[in-house]
């Protein structure tokens, strides 16, 4: 397979459109097989929920010694691109994202990993915060309600593709079963990290209005989801995450 038409170039993967397929190539030839299989298995387990807005997984192959996952190609533009092209429609696009999040959270899958387990492990393994703060976060996480709703785990305008064939949600690597409000808090955080604070606040307002959810309850998840992201982010983003952890009131 000859790779062409680079769609995105991330830290660990490159995504290509090739022969009508989406080809996600892991840059490191030594990428553990378990990592590749985990992404593919998680994606297929979400497919099994019957959600119709997820590109179909096709196969895992090796290209030039590197693992690659091949998916159905979702043609169109990302919601992020549409927002840049027509800022006047920002609220309309944010509402579309809210509706997608509600659709996803209305589903369940007992096969995907548990969100609270993941958050617990992520926070417990941190060395960037002191033990007192870590204890506060883990205690607070323990007290938060445990649900089994499908959570995308990384819903953002860049992961939503809009085209003539419909709307598709991509990048399901971080999908978990858990509390929908934690999933919304992660989306809010994604928007803030992308320097879209105004959009983040509007998104939260629209979500709460549509779902009849208290914004304060969603904000209670923010220090938890922020802490879980610390080890993955760049130094400038870590400063913002630490601010969320330190400034958000944790009601034990």
Task: Please annotate each region the language model reported.
Residues 79-87:
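AlphaC helix of the protein kinase catalytic domain
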Residues 168-171:
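Pre-DFG segment of protein kinase catalytic domains
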Residues 47-59:
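Conserved HxN/HPN-centered segment at the entrance to the catalytic loop
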Residues 186-252:
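Helix-rich C-terminal or lid/interface subdomains of diverse kinases
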Residues 64-78:
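Conserved short submotifs of the Hanks-type protein kinase catalytic core
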Residues 4-37, 44:
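ATP-binding glycine-rich loop module of kinase domains
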Residues 106-153, 157, 163, 243, ...:
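An alpha-helical support segment within catalytic cores of ATP-dependent transferases
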Residues 88-116:
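Internal "kinase-insert"/substrate-recognition segments embedded within catalytic cores
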């Amino acid at each position: 397979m000859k790779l062409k038409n680079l769609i995105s170039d991330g830290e660990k993967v490159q995504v290509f459109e090739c022969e009508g397929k989406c080809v996600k190539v892991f840059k490191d030839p030594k990428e553990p097989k378990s990592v590749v299989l985990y992404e593919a298995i998680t994606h297929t387990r979400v497919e099994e929920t019957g959600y119709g807005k997820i590109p179909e997984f096709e196969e895992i192959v090796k290209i030039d010694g590197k693992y690659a996952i091949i998916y159905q190609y979702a043609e169109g533009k990302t919601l992020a691109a549409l927002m840049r092209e027509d800022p006047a429609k920002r609220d309309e696009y944010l509402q579309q994202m809210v509706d997608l999040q509600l659709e996803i959270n209305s589903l369940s899958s007992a096969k995907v990993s548990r969100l609270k387990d993941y958050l617990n492990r992520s926070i417990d393994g941190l060395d960037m915060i002191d033990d007192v703060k870590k204890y506060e976060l883990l205690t607070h996480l323990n007290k938060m309600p445990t649900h089994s709703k499908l959570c995308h785990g990384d819903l953002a305008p860049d992961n939503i593709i809009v085209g003539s064939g419909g709307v598709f949600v991509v990048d399901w690597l971080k999908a978990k079963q858990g509390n929908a409000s934690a999933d919304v808090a992660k989306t809010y955080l994604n928007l803030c990290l992308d320097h879209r604070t105004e959009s983040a606040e509007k998104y939260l307002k629209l979500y709460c209005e549509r779902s009849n959810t208290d914004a304060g309850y969603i904000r209670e998840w923010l220090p938890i989801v922020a802490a879980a992201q610390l080890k993955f982010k760049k130094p400038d983003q870590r400063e913002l995450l630490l601010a969320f952890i330190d400034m958000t009131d944790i009601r034990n």
